[in-house]
């Protein structure tokens, strides 16, 4: 099974070697047929502490690194 890759915005970089990334998804509400936005926050591994708040990054699923962390930052978008 291929690893999932998600795109989001870094909302916290206070932890050592970890960033918190907010990933937003959009979908049509089943009853109202209105576009709804929902977001979820993921902890991702950042080995070199190079990503800062506001950066748009891609994260990739990986083996669990800690209790809450099973994603790693792959790259940043320009």
Swiss-Prot record:
GO terms for cellular component: cytosolic small ribosomal subunit. PANTHER family: 40S RIBOSOMAL PROTEIN S11 FAMILY MEMBER, SMALL RIBOSOMAL SUBUNIT PROTEIN US17M. SUPFAM superfamilies: Nucleic acid-binding proteins. This is Small ribosomal subunit protein uS17. InterPro entries: NA-bd_OB-fold, Ribosomal_uS17, Ribosomal_uS17_bact/chlr. It comes from Allorhizobium ampelinum (strain ATCC BAA-846 / DSM 112012 / S4). GO terms for molecular function: rRNA binding; structural constituent of ribosome. It holds the Pfam family Ribosomal_S17. It comes from the Bacteria. Belongs to the universal ribosomal protein uS17 family. NCBIfam families: PRK05610.1, uS17_bact. One of the primary rRNA binding proteins, it binds specifically to the 5'-end of 16S ribosomal RNA. Part of the 30S ribosomal subunit. GO terms for biological process: translation. The keyword Signal does not apply. Keywords: Ribonucleoprotein, Ribosomal protein, RNA-binding, rRNA-binding. The lineage of its organism: Bacteria, Pseudomonadati, Pseudomonadota, Alphaproteobacteria, Hyphomicrobiales. The keyword RNA-binding applies.
């Amino acid at each position: 099974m291929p690893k999932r890759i998600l795109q989001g915005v870094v909302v916290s970089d206070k932890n050592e070697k970890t960033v918190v990334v907010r990933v937003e998804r959009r979908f049509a509400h089943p009853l109202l047929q209105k576009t709804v936005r929902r977001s979820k926050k993921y902890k991702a591994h950042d080995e070199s502490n190079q990503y800062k708040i506001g950066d748009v990054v891609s994260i990739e699923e990986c083996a669990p690194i800690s209790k809450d962390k099973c994603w790693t930052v792959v790259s940043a978008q320009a």
